[in-house]
Swiss-Prot record:
Pathway: Aromatic compound metabolism; 3-phenylpropanoate degradation
Originating gene: mhpF
Binding site for NAD(+): S15, G16, N17, I18, S164, A165, G166, P167, A168, T169, R170, A171, N172, N274
S-S pairs: none
UniProt keyword list: Aromatic hydrocarbons catabolism, NAD, Oxidoreductase
InterPro entries: Acetaldehyde_dehydrogenase (IPR003361), Acetylaldehyde_DH_C (IPR015426), NAD(P)-bd_dom_sf (IPR036291), Semialdehyde_DH_NAD-bd (IPR000534)
Free-text function comment from the UniProt entry: Catalyzes the conversion of acetaldehyde to acetyl-CoA, using NAD(+) and coenzyme A. Is the final enzyme in the meta-cleavage pathway for the degradation of aromatic compounds.
Protein name as catalogued: Acetaldehyde dehydrogenase
Amino acid sequence: MTNLNKKVRVGIIGSGNIGTDLLIKTMRSESLTCTIFAGRNFNSAGMKRANELGVHISDRGIQAILDDPSICDVVFDATSAQAHIEHWRELEPLDKTVIDMTPAKVGGFCIPAINAEEILASGNRNINMVTCGGQSSIPIANAISSVHPEFEYIEVASSIASRSAGPATRANLDEYIDTTEKALKQFTGAQRTKAILILNPAVPPIDMQTTIYAKIDRPNIAAIDAAVREMVERLKRYVPGYQLVLPPTLDGNRVVTTVKVMGNGDYLPQYAGNLDIINCAAIAVTEMISSLRYGK
């Protein structure tokens, strides 16, 4: 088999919404293939879907990979922040690249539109995808900081459909806030950051929406607008449903920008843009790994 025909073999731990949507996206990728889908319950919706697709499944979680390390090259950990810490201890000696879908922040933060090439070049084998709110807000915050690197405070508020927040999301809310705020500081240089997550119970469910507030002294709105629009186009390359709803607008001493994310509807409903954006980001960086290995 030539390099052009080779695909990066992906193992997925976690058969919930995130894991199952990752499975569908992996199977549709020209450069990735899923060789093991591991959860805890063969009767879960995700396991049943994987079985229907002919994917090798296991109800032994991470143990399925530990028992046969050769089964995959890259591992998506779609479990929980607490579980990931233990998973990494077990996977690190196996020389696997692990894409962490949880807010455990064990590895380096990755926002594909900003630093995918940099983090892959660093050789970091634990790649943290931050959070859904981080993936939607940090690119905009980073674009603003490219124009005004001196701003002191940034706040991001993400509103998501309550139906899209599964047990792992709800259990990791404290970790979500902490990880999002730390990543905001890293990618903007802001002295102070604040992250808010709102679970909206509205029916019909709302699309994910994120508003970014940046406190800037004498902001150059025209330059900020140009930088933000360029960043939005960069994101659309791997998140087609990413939209600029409110362009950078001056509100007192704050610059306010709002974006919306509609999901692809691969496995999850379109309103679950919060899950879709972090999964699209994970697929994008893993496809870059494939490109580096096999030239495609």
